[in-house]
Amino acid sequence: MEFKRCSGILMPISSLPGGYGIGSMGKPARDFVDFLTRAGQTIWQILPVGPTGYADSPYQSCSAFAGNPYFIDLDLLAADGLLTKKDYANINWGGDAAKVDYGTLYEKRFTVLRKAYHNFMRQRPVPGYDTPYSDDWYRFQFLSSDWLPDYCLYMAIKEDNGMVDWQQWPRALRVREPEALARFRAEHAEEIEFWAFLQYEFDRQWRSLHAYAKSKGIAIMGDIPIYVAADSADAWAGRELFETDAEGKPRRVAGCPPDYFAADGQLWGNPLYDWNYHRSTGYAWWICRLRHALSIYDILRIDHFRGFDTYWAIPAGETTARNGRWEQGPRMDLFRALHNALGSLPIVAEDLGEMFDSVRQLLAESGFPGMKVLQFAFTGEDSVDLPHNYPRNCVAYPGTHDNNTLSGWFGEELTPAQRKQVEEYFVLTKQEGIVRGMLRGVQASTAALAIIPMADWLEEPAASRMNTPGMAQGNWQWRADAKKLTPALAKEMRTMAVRYFRHTDK
């Protein structure tokens, strides 16, 4: 696909301002959509919205299909009569409004959501009866039947076993013995239904938000990781999809080879796909996954796109990524199958880092736009990430969720020589401001789409960085201050979008 010339904002749902500890899909999200409209933006890019687990990373979700219950808006539940304000308004959701406290959310949020579930069940319909919920409730379960039952069963068993990794469950449940699963379903029916209720509410609220954004001319760009987490419903219930043994343990895992930045490489630990199996099914699971994603997003960014061409396979049990080897992925065979099943694919390929020629060939053959990141550009050479080298069919960023904020990058990461190069390249002035000058450079580039992290428009310091790769704790916490999303800022953003023909004032 090719974008018309436009601009957008990278803003995670979790980072939206508002009460109750984390951004949500209610008024905070709609207010942000309104802000984007006033600011002349066209696209709202978010991070993956799946349930988070260890280290709170949205890229290590326990499901490739489920939504994060933390994003369910409590005020909307109250408006539906499922909660009262006193159920949640006076709870301490964390001591710092500028950061998400995931520990506090885990301790307190599900207690409130269970109240909503029990109130919902008191109104629980019998199929065929005319109630406010009957049609939607049963329709959602029917339409989600290819993933919802296994996910809810997985979460209920996980909770019953102290939330440990499924590889540590009792063997009968771990290997999915039919009698053991049937017995667990019978004994824990209410708990299984609770997890289904959370997904129902997430789906209702998300689709309402998505429709609202569309009505305001805002397209939502979602994000999916190429791999699923080892501790996930997908790995537990669909072990034939992965390189696993009879016990469901991975034979090989994902990562990256050693390079200049990491002498031991990166050991991610995700189970690798059994691409021969996927090919034998016509890529049915991938078709299901992308059909679901494209039903909730307008555009889809796929993380680690290079893994579809060649991927680094590390023997399970290794403590570093050194002893891995390159293996060939499905390449265009997968994307042809997806196109045949789903039609035009509005995909953005995350193609950052060292790339083989075969990866570039795959990107060119697919026609998907790749990414360019300003913070990678200033090496003293004529980098492909310098704005004057951007092709039209790409997405330009000053930085991504894995980068420092522009303010932090310029002030703390660059050498004096690099700062001088940046200043001269963009002709930076004190009057305009360092960060504003760099944003101008990205917006003025020939890239069809320019995406600016909201933190950079707000000129947030390094402390507001969303993620530092390789650091296990302290990530994914930043939240915006609603007071900074001013009419003056929206006007400034709109003016820049109009100036560089990324928006037209009518």
List PLM regions with ranges:
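N-terminal catalytic cores of NTP/NDP-binding nucleotidyl/phosphoryl-transfer enzymes
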Residues: 8, 12-31
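Catalytic domains of carbohydrate-active enzymes, especially glycoside hydrolases
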Residues: 2, 27-52, 295-297, 442
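Conserved, well-ordered alpha-helix/loop/beta-strand core segments that scaffold catalytic motifs
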Residues: 195-228
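Alpha-amylase-like alpha-glycosidases and glucanotransferases acting on alpha-linked glucans and related
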Residues: 1-5, 12, 18, 55-203, ...
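Short alpha-helical segments and helix-capping/turn motifs at coil-helix boundaries
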Residues: 27-34, 204-212, 286-288, 434-438
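Surface-exposed amphipathic alpha-helices with a cationic face
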Residues: 37, 206-214, 339, 363-364
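Outer-envelope exported proteins of Gram-negative bacteria
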Residues: 47, 219-221, 225, 299, ...
